[in-house]
Amino acid sequence: MLRIGIVAHPRRKAMAEKLFADVDADVIRYDNSKRRVGCEANHRRVWADLVQIAKPGDWILCLEDDAVPVPCFRTSVTAALKHAPSPVVSLYLGQGRPSQWLPRMKQAVARADREDASWIVGDATIHGVGIAILGPDLVEEMLHKTVLYKGPIDQRMSMWLRQFQMRAAYTFPSLVDHADVETVIEQHPDGRPRERGRVAWRFGNRTKWSNRRVPL
């Protein structure tokens, strides 16, 4: 079974509730605007909520409120995850940032196109837009380990992956796009403004998924 949670900000309530309905999500958590828990802490709350309702063997998916899902989302994601080459899956590989990853992304996307690969596999979760983890035990391990790290949730998860020599598998094409709207984060950890252009390299679905993969 696929369990889905939405990480939401009050300024995007309408967007978040539409996403909640579109993907038939199980959980939604708002980062209260008066007593903010913070973006990273809100991610952790959603993961923890999903652990409480998930069973062994379930995929647990955390979506940010600006995720744009493909049609027939649950069916599409379930079909892809049957062939996942890793227990950690990102549904989004985006252009625009971070700049240091762009050359490698471009090469991987070109190779995936040539080889008709369903997956691009690397040692980092570059984006937090949509991440799925197999089983509540692994999610609990992630929560336990990443609390020791600093930085945004995607960077913390990347450190966790590298520490335990795990990989993140990106669906190709991406099963969620990124609604390239104004950020709700007042100050990003790197101090840099977010420019437009943060959309998926490829967005859509496949008629048939496989375990064919290329490296990132």
In which residue ranges do the predicted regions lie?
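An acidic/histidine-cluster motif and surrounding catalytic segment
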Residues: 1-63, 67-216
